[in-house]
Amino acid sequence: MGRNDTKVIHIGDRVIGGGNPILIQSMTNTKTDDVEATVAQINKLADAGCDIIRCAVPNMEAANALSSIKSKINIPLVADIHFDYKLAIAAIENGADKIRINPGNIGSTDRIKAVVDAAKDKNIPIRVGVNSGSLEKEIVEKNGGVTAEGIVESAIDKVRIIEDLGYDNLVVSIKSSDVLMCVKAHELVSKEINYPLHVGITESGTIISGNIKSSIGLGLILNQGIGDTIRVSLTGDPLEEIKSAKLILRTLGLREGGIEVVSCPTCGRTQIDLISLANQVENMVADIPLNIKVAVMGCVVNGPGEAKEADIGIAGGINEGLIIKKGEIIKKVPEDKLISELRNELLNWSE
């Protein structure tokens, strides 16, 4: 079922499903019971464009810290729970806007019911999360190994457990580090349930490998109309996850806003330190709320022509460069003034 037809779910003051905009999620890597550090990281992520934040709750200290954290942030908080149902209940009591559990590792039906009852009392959603690395032995054996079909079977089994307890305020996530398996699993599960799907490639890797795997996986899934929230899982600063997620959504035409920076790959004609210049421009435009394309080109010979599809651009030359707007050269400036002149044009932008 495509995102236009999924069930509408409220997470704090945000709404997903039913064709609502796809929201970006990340996860803190601080110790959750270190309230000051956790709040600082969440607020940085929110400023960068994070819509929903998830925090690990490995112990009761972390669960009890959630109320203090909640009072100092402005985006919904999801509590990530494994194994101990008491932590899930404590997280709910301390104000979590959603909890993430795998009913398969919470324990007996009575324990799952206790968690469901607590969520029902606060009317907060439960995210049912299944990972290819934690599939039940019998499902793996039945399918001859870890498969997309097995991931979906496990997820639906967990959903039915909670539905049978009288609750359907649910979000579902099915993840694998195998990109094509993850894509197939999402294609299959979207035909079986109407709950919103949180999409991500788990254990995708470091900045380079993680971005490539996530871009391919999320792109293939989202472009089919599947997925209601996303996370780009990276081994690194969570801020990088937000940058990547925003770019993926913008590239797919699923979100507007924010300046898109394009740059040439350099060649023997390059007459300027283009790599440094492109990075400086990307950092410089991060806080400018325009929905335009900025080109950074390496030479004044081909630069103006190649920058025609951008709204504005710069092209480097020997000790000087050009400012190009809508394909027309509007000024020539010294090399060391290119960034400041470009920023001035952006701050005074008019169509």
Task: Outline where the language-model segments fall.
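Active-site mouth loops of central-metabolism enzymes
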Residues: G19-A37, A56, I75-F83, I139-V152, ...
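Alpha-helix-loop-beta-strand connector modules within alpha/beta enzyme cores
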Residues: M60-I81, A114-I126, H186-L197, V281-N283
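Hydrophobic or amphipathic alpha-helical targeting/insertion segments
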Residues: K86-R127
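Hydrophobic faces of well-ordered beta-strands that scaffold small-molecule active sites
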Residues: I22-T28, I53-C55, L77-I81, I99-I101, ...
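N-terminal amphipathic alpha-helix/helix-capping segment at the start of soluble metabolic enzymes
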Residues: M1-M27, K120, N283
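Catalytic alpha/beta core domains of metabolic enzymes, predominantly
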Residues: N131, I139-A286
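Glycine-rich, proline-tolerant flexible connector loops at the mouths of alpha/beta enzymes
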Residues: N29, D34-V35, A46-I69, R100-S108, ...
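Glycine-enriched alpha-helix->loop->beta-strand junction motifs that scaffold or abut catalytic
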Residues: I73-I75, E93-I99, K120-N123, S190-P196, ...
